Amino acid sequence: MELHFADAQQKPENQIKAIRDFIDRGVDVIAFAPVIETGWEEVLQECQKAGIPVILVDRGIDAGIDSSLYTTMIASDHVWAGEQAAVVMAELLSGSGVVVELQGTIGASATIQREQGFDDYMAANCPGIQIVAHQSGDFTRDQGRAVMAELLATYEHIDGVFAHNDDMALGAIEAIQEAGLKPGEDIKIISVDGVKGAFEAVLAGTLNCTVECTPLLAAQIFDTAAALKAGEAVDKWIVSNDDIYTADKVTQEIIDGRTY
């Protein structure tokens, strides 16, 4: 199997340009991770017209877009990830406290769905927990740090932080430490992804939990592309296998074996 790759620099307009280039090259299958949920209908129609199956990777597209325009999606269940983060947060806070939420990129399906899972669970099950702020850190460590510093200056007391990814959580940890507080103790922190740095923080006690969202999807992408090329049917949503990691589960051996 021959692989053609384009780096879109996290810009949807670059992704659309790359997809059109792949159409012009006459590739057999196109796989991409939508930066945001909206704006894909026209280019997906072009793929369909060209007879090229499309695999969505890691993130989905707006539910209002005709799902027949893509063939399958290989991704984590981001709503589930948000729900699991809420379950752990509720336990850590004993059902009562003030929580802030560090959102990912606005408009990204991972942002929307992780927030949905977390907020809906809290609303339905935890009347004593108040989510006082939702602010985007754009999935970056620097922005996570800056946003957390701003929230600490705005709110007199914060009990918990839910970060939509580990990078923002690691930035938030820095901001909390700079404010003279103990992350993981004074302020409980939960994030999503399960990267090596997050595992190290869990082991150190500065991060309470990370909900895994594995990026290691290449094997599934290649297997699915091969199946599509062979004319085989595939599931509409292929869910990746993820887990929840708290201090009782993270070991140095797991950290050493982490490749991302």
Question: What residue spans do the PLM features occupy?
Answer:
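Extracytoplasmic "Venus flytrap"
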Residues: 2-21, 25-27, 33-37, 103-113, ...
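Structural recognition of the beta-strand scaffold that forms the well-ordered cores
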Residues: 4-5, 29-33, 53-58, 73-75, ...
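Short beta-strand elements in bilobed, periplasmic/extracellular small-molecule ligand-binding domains
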Residues: 1-8, 98-101, 123-141
